[in-house]
Amino acid sequence: MKKAHIISHTHWDREWYLPYEKHHMLYIEMMDTLIDTMEKDQEYKCFHLDGQTIMLEDYLQVRPENRARLQKLIEDGRIAIGPWYVLQDEFLTSSESNVRNLQMGYKLAQEFGGKWTKIGYFPDSFGNMGQAPQLLKKAGIDTAVFGRGVKPTGFNNQTTEAYESTYSEMNWQSADGSAVLGILFANWYNNGVEVPVEEEKSKEYWDKKLADAVRYASTDQLLFMNGCDHQPVQTDLSSAIRTANALYPDVEFVHSNFTDYVEQVKKELPDDLNTITGELLSLIHI
């Protein structure tokens, strides 16, 4: 049976098309909603906080009174934090900065109970550095997920260049021989956003989403990213998952997290994964 892992997240550029403080206030609203939703809905299992622990500081700067509520959700494994301190452009920062970024992310995670997500998270980096597998392995991390670097399909499953891997899963190797499991967001990191609750819309939605994911996945574990840039929390997701499970008896839909997803992917990996070496440079924007 295929398993659809729906991972809720938001990708938070702290300053982009709006000034920092406007993005900051939108982020506070998102986090307020997330905490309230998780406390009220125990079926809303987990939220991936974009791989950057600085978001904890950003929230508590405005809502220091909510630290205990936030920390409990982190300690319970429901809000997943780290490994980085901040999501970086890997080619604009120095090598030492990339090392310190990981160290600072780990240190801050310890202040919130020590549940540090051991996933090298590069959702929207404009290319990935060749020594990332080496750095991650030194930190005890053996898996990386990323959106760019090996010609992902992008929005609406459109491929503009030849794909460089047989599957969305691959071996990614540094020059020193260090290797991690690499997982590409082959249908981007919004391929499970705004899941419909109503049956007819849900059927139309999942027919396409499942077909797109199966096209690239090497296992029966399918990844659906329930979020996008500055995406609010989908507060009715639990109902949407119940609808999907009723519609597709041959697929198990679960509200998941990267730790559980990767653990199950590793059990089913085929022997013919491609090995991608060094820098991942396709689909970068300079």
Language model regions located:
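Catalytic-domain carbohydrate-binding cleft regions of carbohydrate-active enzymes
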Residues: 1-284
